[in-house]
Regions:
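Catalytic cores of the polymerase beta-like nucleotidyltransferase superfamily
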Residues: 1-220
């Protein structure tokens, strides 16, 4: 699958566009964890991607499910997103041409690392350093990120448990101050994250996180 993703990057670049693998696949590759879900970002607009690969575009905030050599890839145009509090879906999407600006909209630094067509890592937000130091850190203002999508509270806990990482202090305090906003999430979204959390086999660490949140509440 990875080789086919690299082929997609080369095709897009041969047509004059920038393109990278990004997100969870890159994170897992660095951690030597198997992953079969590859996301690609590009400055090509959705209609341009569809034209290059002769496929149809179903509008989904600039994302296309691209079938290539029997593999499915999500190809997304560089963009900025505008949110209302606690609403995970942006009310406005603006296509842009700048890679770093696109990466800034993501949740955690560990999910911001890219791979280019040559297989080289592009790390504009120090995600590799945080992986090496086992830290879950928000990109930009943690409070803003959590308010954009409270599911990031559960995602931070999930990554901490699955990869045995520590949640950065400012993010932990932000989680504590906003934990009640989980109630704005749909049951299905909560259940999906909780299933992963409770199946991570890290019950002791989960209890420690819960105890820490209780202590923070007491100290406040």
């Amino acid at each position: 699958m990875y080789k086919n993703a690299i082929k997609i990057l080369n095709i897009l670049e041969n047509n004059g566009y920038k393109a990278y693998i990004v997100g969870g696949y890159v994170r897992d590759k660095i951690l030597n964890v198997k992953s079969n879900d590859i996301d690609i970002i590009t400055n090509a607009l959705p209609d341009e991607v569809c034209k290059i690969f002769n496929t149809e575009h179903t509008d989904n905030f600039g994302s296309i499910k691209l079938k290539y050599n029997n593999y499915i890839f999500e190809v997304t145009t560089f963009r900025k997103e505008y949110y209302k509090n606690n609403d995970r879906r942006p009310y406005k999407v603006e296509y842009i041409d700048d890679l770093k600006e696109d990466l800034m909209r993501r949740d955690f630094t560990i999910n911001s690392i890219c791979i280019d067509k040559n297989g080289m890592y592009i790390d504009l937000l120090n995600g590799i350093n945080d992986i090496n130091n086992k830290i879950i850190r928000c990109i930009g203002n943690a409070n803003t990120k959590i308010n954009e999508d409270p599911l990031r509270i559960l995602r931070a806990i999930r990554f901490s448990l699955v990869y045995d990482f520590n949640i950065e202090d400012n993010l932990m305090n932000t989680i504590y101050n906003n934990v009640e906003k989980i109630r704005y999430l749909s049951f299905d979204r909560i259940r999906k994250e909780l299933d992963i959390i409770f199946n991570a086999g890290k019950s002791n660490k989960l209890l420690n996180l819960i105890n820490l949140l209780i202590c923070l509440k007491f100290l406040k």
